[in-house]
Amino acid sequence: METINRQIIDIKKLVNEFSDFARMPSPILKKIKIDDILNRAVSFYKLSNEDLTLNINKKNKSDIYINGDSEHLNRVFLNLLKNSIEAIDEKKQKDPNLKGKITLEIDTNNEYIEIKMLDNGIGFKDVTNITKPYFTTKKQGTGLGLPIVSKIINDHGGDINFFKNSDGAKIEITLPIYS
């Protein structure tokens, strides 16, 4: 009976994520401060992951605004942070002394903001298929999280790239600065 209940929960999760992916509304764009989005997502996970170091490093100390949908972008960073935490937890199973670390580095030029997210988890197994719907390397994964993230970033006129890193994973996001 427990197996059936777990499968029902998994199917509900898959249906909900598929619905989100298929019917994702267009973003409602307005001037937002990117720091607010990042701080909100980081704060959410800091509370429940006290043994994890979560840092935001800004090269430019002034406020940075983008034309974005705060709810959509919050979803992006919550999803990416969740994936990083899961990757760190998986690596901790092999190395219990590992001190988990996630760093968000923010830099700008005249036109774009660049957000680099680095973690010291297990890293990506396959970056070529990572944003294809239903591709997953997780036992409980639906393969829709990163395609949704990619779609949201693209809908904001941005770009997202995933890299294998010798020490974990690296994600680079660029978004146009509000003008």
Q: What is the meaning of each model-derived region?
A:
Residues 145, 149:
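Short alpha-helical Gxxx[C/S/T] motif in the catalytic ATP-binding
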Residues 124-134:
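Short conserved segment of the HATPase_c
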Residues 153-154:
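Detector for a conserved hydrophobic position within an alpha-helical segment of the HATPase_c
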Residues 53-64:
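Conserved catalytic submotifs in the C-terminal HATPase_c
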Residues 86-108:
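ATP-lid-like helix-loop hinge signature
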Residues 28-42:
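A conserved beta-strand-to-alpha-helix junction within the catalytic ATP-binding
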Residues 24-27, 65-68, 137:
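Conserved micro-motifs of the catalytic ATP-binding
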